[in-house]
């Protein structure tokens, strides 16, 4: 595989992973409002959030294959740990890295504000959120074992074990 082909592969995979991170984070946000009432709902939300975070991390590793590692890691660290003003500068740098389509998705995902509102600006660029039943069916076929476990758990009797208000 030559350098041009590997860059194309990295770019394509980065877009795909960014879209998946968006889907999982958005679906977790939607399922979290109102607060999950059962352990299986809570586990599903946690599995989606975890998957989104892993996809996001993978996007940054893929960007390192397209850009200077030091720059990408610096942007990633600022986005994870800095306050709003510095984060906005890092988002600006991120928007100019790698594949514009992928980094635009990442910038929108990492910006401050309501995730559902931000998703509306990306209509057509990321798949719309799935209904819970469809989501569970599709996650059951996932290669991610945590998503599969969460999907199988979500199929069990809903409301069977309500979370106590003390938690």
What residues fall within each predicted segment?
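Long, helix-rich interaction regions
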Residues: 1-167
């Amino acid at each position: 595989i030559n350098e041009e082909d590997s860059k194309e592969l990295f770019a394509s995979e980065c877009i795909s992973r960014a879209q998946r991170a968006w889907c999982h984070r958005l679906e977790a946000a939607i399922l979290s409002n109102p607060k999950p009432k059962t352990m299986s709902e809570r586990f599903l939300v946690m599995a989606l959030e975890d998957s989104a975070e892993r996809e996001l991390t993978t996007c940054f590793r893929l960007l390192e294959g397209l850009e200077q590692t030091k720059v990408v890691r610096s942007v990633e660290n600022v986005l994870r740990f800095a306050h709003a003003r510095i984060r906005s500068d890092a988002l600006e740098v991120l928007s100019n890295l790698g594949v514009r389509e992928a980094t635009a998705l990442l910038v929108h995902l990492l910006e401050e504000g309501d995730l559902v509102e931000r998703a509306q600006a990306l209509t057509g660029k990321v798949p719309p959120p799935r209904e819970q039943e469809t989501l569970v069916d599709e996650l059951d076929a996932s290669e991610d074992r945590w998503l599969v476990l969460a999907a199988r758990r979500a199929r069990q009797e809903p409301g069977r074990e309500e979370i106590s208000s003390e938690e």
